[in-house]
Structures are given as structure tokens and as C-alpha cells.
Amino acid sequence: MNRFVIQLIQLYKRLLSPLLPPACRFTPTCSEYAAQAFQEYGFFRALQLSIWRILRCNPLSRGFDDPLPPNTKG
């Protein structure tokens, strides 16, 4: 399931992202962060991290360097 989601993110980055103005306020970008989360964590934890990140990426946020938290569960 995670591979499928990563492929969807890559498809978004190739097809839709170039058509939109740069808007992500974080480093790495929200799509890169989500792809990393789905590579590192199980489906539900990666989904939780990705949704929380996207909710924080808005005009009221200053944005900053926000790397993926380390996976301590292995």
C-alpha cells in the first residue's frame, strides 16, 4: 500500500506540482515529507504525519526546516 501512495505522490510531483505556484512553507516540501513518511513508517502513521504536515502548511504558518521525526520503532 505504501508503494502505491508513493507512486501517487510522484505522479502529483510530475504532473500537477509544476502547474501550481510554489506554496510550501517547509523544508522538505510537503510532498517530499509525505513520500519520506511512507518510506519510513507504516501506512497509518505515515498518513497521520502527512495530514498533520499539510494542515500546518498554510498562510498563517511561518514555515521552517521540519524533517521527518526518527522512526524509533524500527
Swiss-Prot record:
Localization in the cell: Cell inner membrane
Membrane topology (UniProt): Peripheral membrane protein
Protein's UniProt keywords contain Cell inner membrane: yes
Assigned keywords, A-Z: Cell inner membrane, Cell membrane, Membrane
Coiled-coil blocks: none
Transcription listed as a keyword: no
Protein name: Putative membrane protein insertion efficiency factor
Role summary: Could be involved in insertion of integral membrane proteins into the membrane.
Origin: domain of life: Bacteria
One GO term describing the cellular component: plasma membrane
Family: Belongs to the UPF0161 family.
Organism for this UniProt entry: Leptospira interrogans serogroup Icterohaemorrhagiae serovar Lai (strain 56601)
Main subcellular location: membrane
Pfam families cross-referenced by the UniProt entry: YidD (PF01809)
